[in-house]
């Protein structure tokens, strides 16, 4: 099903199958059944694991119940946007009914109508029981334009899913329109500069000082800003800000795969793989081009270079190979880290390969089978745990929304 909204092409290719039992042996499962198994469990992170008052995604779910920051009821805007698109996949896969999906979305939108918002942008985190902002950092206690763009990407997909339905479904779409029209992208130019800014705080103003320049996960923010019917920004913001007046172009070719765009802070070998996922869950990169790059090549080559790096395994970590690859930001042996070739700590994050299914179907399927064969030490209630180290035989039974919630919709985009 192609979902188009204004200048955006939101793509969810949705089919109908029954999910097979997750307890089935991998060698008895077809590729489709194995994808069903993983989609169903990761879908449940957002469905069964949602914070009950808001219906939104918890920032993290720790199966062992250990929450050092006492943040088990903190919810996330960006991760929820990914989870919202997982609901659409879940409806058409038969995990929940269309009516159940509608009721969950009504709860979510009702929460968003009254939750803390700053010139149309939501914070990175809220307290789920109150809708009040939970600071992400000392000065990061206001609007987060990028995380809101990820959330709105999901809401617009839901808008198109229900817009031609019954009266309740049309009413939901109308409420989403109001949230969409309220996003003040023009405010986040910080005084009409030709660039968007990531943060604004009612207490600290623009002190975070993070302009959205150069290639990372943020493309969808500029696409939405350009297509806003109420608070759009001029093309100069994209060209001078995001594209750095042409400075975004790259000649780097790790393992023979041209990156085409300079990855911020990782220009030679490429950044963490979530950069190839977050903006493209709803935005179809096929045939998406501008004067700087072909975005299908950008995301596919990023994934393939990451795959080839792990297969080549220059640091000699145990376990790396064609069926065990994928570097991205996740939990790590010591805290949290943005894993990538220039920051390879021997930690594999399953979402890196699994959310790359649209770009690397054969390589991602090999990884899926390889992860599944490893068994219960990395597999739990909501699918594969956030990260593991085959070299150190390390994992923890922890999940993060921004990793888990991309898997089901990106596998669906592939299917």
State the predicted function of each range.
Residues 24-415:
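Ser/Thr/Asn(+Pro)-rich, low-complexity disordered segments
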Residues 1-26:
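Bacterial Sec-dependent N-terminal signal peptides
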């Amino acid at each position: 099903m192609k979902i188009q909204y204004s200048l955006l092409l939101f793509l969810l290719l949705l089919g109908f199958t029954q999910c097979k039992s997750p307890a089935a042996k991998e060698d008895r499962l077809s590729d489709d059944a194995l994808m069903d198994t993983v989609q169903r469990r990761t879908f449940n992170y957002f469905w069964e694991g949602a914070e009950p008052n808001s219906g939104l995604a918890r920032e993290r779910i720790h199966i062992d119940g250990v929450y050092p920051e006492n943040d088990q009821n903190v919810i996330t805007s960006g991760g929820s946007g990914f989870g919202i698109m997982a609901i659409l996949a879940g409806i058409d896969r038969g995990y929940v009914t269309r009516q159940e999906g509608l009721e969950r979305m009504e709860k979510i939108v009702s929460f968003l109508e009254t939750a803390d918002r700053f010139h149309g942008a939501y914070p990175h985190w809220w307290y789920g029981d109150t809708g009040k902002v939970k600071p992400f950092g000392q000065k990061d206690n206001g609007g987060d334009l990028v995380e809101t763009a990820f959330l709105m990407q999901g809401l617009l997909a839901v808008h198109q899913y229900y817009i031609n339905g019954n009266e309740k479904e049309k009413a939901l779409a109308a409420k989403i329109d109001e949230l969409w029209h309220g996003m003040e992208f023009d405010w986040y130019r910080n005084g009409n500069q030709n660039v968007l800014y990531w943060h604004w705080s009612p207490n600290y103003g623009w002190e975070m000082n993070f302009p959205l320049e150069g290639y990372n996960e943020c493309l969808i923010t500029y696409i939405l800003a350009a297509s806003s019917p109420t608070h759009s920004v001029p093309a100069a913001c994209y060209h001078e800000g995001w594209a750095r007046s042409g400075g975004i172009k790259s000649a780097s070719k790790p393992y023979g795969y041209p990156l085409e765009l300079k990855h911020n802070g990782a220009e030679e070998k490429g950044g963490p793989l979530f950069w190839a996922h977050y903006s493209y869950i709803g935005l179809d990169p096929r045939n998406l081009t501008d004067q700087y790059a072909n975005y299908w090549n950008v995301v596919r080559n990023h994934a393939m270079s990451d795959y080839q790096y792990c297969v080549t395994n220059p640091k000699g970590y145990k376990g790396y190979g064609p069926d065990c690859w994928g570097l991205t930001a996740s939990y790590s042996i010591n805290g949290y880290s943005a894993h990538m070739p220039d920051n390879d700590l021997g930690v594999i994050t399953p979402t890196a390969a699994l959310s790359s299914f649209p770009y690397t179907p054969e390589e991602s399927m090999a990884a899926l089978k390889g992860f599944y064969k490893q068994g219960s030490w990395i597999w739990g209630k909501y699918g594969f745990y956030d990260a593991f180290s085959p070299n150190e035989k390390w994992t923890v039974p922890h999940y993060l929304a921004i990793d888990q919630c991309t898997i089901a919709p990106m596998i669906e985009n592939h299917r």
